[in-house]
A protein has these predicted regions:
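Hydrophobic, Leu/Ile/Phe/Ala-enriched alpha-helical segments that form helix-helix packing faces
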Residues: 23, 88-92, 146, 150-153
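Acidic/histidine-rich catalytic neighborhood of metal-dependent amide-processing enzymes
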Residues: 3-83, 97-100, 104-105
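Gly/Ser/Thr-rich active-site loops/lids in small-molecule metabolic enzymes
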Residues: 80-90, 138-146
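Short helix-capping/linker segments at secondary-structure and domain boundaries
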Residues: 26-30, 113-116, 153-156
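Zn-dependent metallopeptidase/amidohydrolase metal-coordination segment
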Residues: 96-142
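Alpha-helical scaffold segments in soluble metabolic enzymes
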Residues: 19-22, 107, 141, 145-148
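His/Asp/Glu-rich mid-to-C-terminal helical/loop segments that flank catalytic regions of hydrolases
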Residues: 126-180
Length: 180
C-alpha cells in the first residue's frame, strides 16, 4: 500500500491485562477491574462504584513502563502504607519506590479507597510510539512479583490518603516570583 499505517503495540495496557488474566487463572478468589480512558483523564476509574473495593486487601495496578519502578506516591500523595511496603519486600524482587503521574489508583484514592495501592512496572517500553515493545523477561518478573504479593501479603493493608495530589498551579506564585 502507498500509505502504510502502523499502530503501536498497546503494551502499556495489554501487559497489565495479561497479568490480570494470568492471576484470574491461578487464584480462586481475586478481584480484577479494567477501566477505560486512563490516558485521557482516568474517566473510567472516576466513575467506579467504590463498594466493589469494600473487601479488598490492597490494589495493584500493573501499568508502569520499565522493569523496576514501584509507584508508591504521585506528587505529594502517598498511595500505600509503610507496613505494606515492608510486607511486599520490593528490593528483594528488584523494584524501587518511585513517584508517578496521574493514574487510575490515584483517582480511586481520591474517591475514598482506603487500602494500600501500587502501580508496578510491567515490562513495556516506548509507550504510545511506533517503537513500543514488551520485554518478556520483564513482563514475567512483574507477574511473579504480583503473585508474590497476592500469596504472601495476606493481611489487609489500610491506607487513607491524607495529602492532596500535586497541582502544577500549587507553586505558581513562586514560579512567577522567580521570573520577575
Amino acid at each position: 500500500p502507498k500509505h502504510k499505517r502502523f499502530e503501536n503495540l498497546g503494551a502499556d495496557d495489554k501487559n497489565g491485562v495479561f497479568i490480570c488474566l494470568e492471576c484470574l487463572k491461578k487464584y480462586d478468589s481475586i478481584k480484577v477491574v479494567f477501566f477505560r480512558e486512563e490516558e485521557t483523564g482516568c474517566r473510567g476509574s472516576s466513575e467506579a462504584v467504590m463498594s466493589f473495593f469494600d473487601d479488598v486487601r490492597f490494589v495493584i495496578q500493573p501499568d508502569r513502563k520499565g522493569n523496576s519502578d514501584l509507584i508508591t506516591s504521585i506528587g505529594y500523595a502517598d498511595l500505600c502504607s509503610e507496613g505494606f511496603m515492608e510486607a511486599i519486600e520490593p528490593e528483594k524482587w528488584g523494584y524501587m519506590e518511585e513517584n508517578g503521574l496521574m493514574t487510575d489508583i490515584l483517582t480511586l484514592k481520591e474517591k475514598g479507597l482506603e487500602v494500600s495501592c501500587l502501580n508496578v512496572s510491567c515490562g513495556y517500553y516506548n509507550a504510545h510510539t511506533d517503537e513500543e515493545i514488551t520485554v518478556k523477561k520483564d513482563l514475567m518478573k512483574s507477574l511473579l512479583f504480583v503473585e508474590h504479593i497476592i500469596e504472601d501479603c495476606t493481611n489487609t493493608y489500610p491506607h487513607t490518603q491524607s495529602d492532596s495530589y500535586f497541582s502544577p498551579y500549587e507553586f505558581e506564585d513562586e514560579i512567577y516570583d522567580i521570573r520577575l
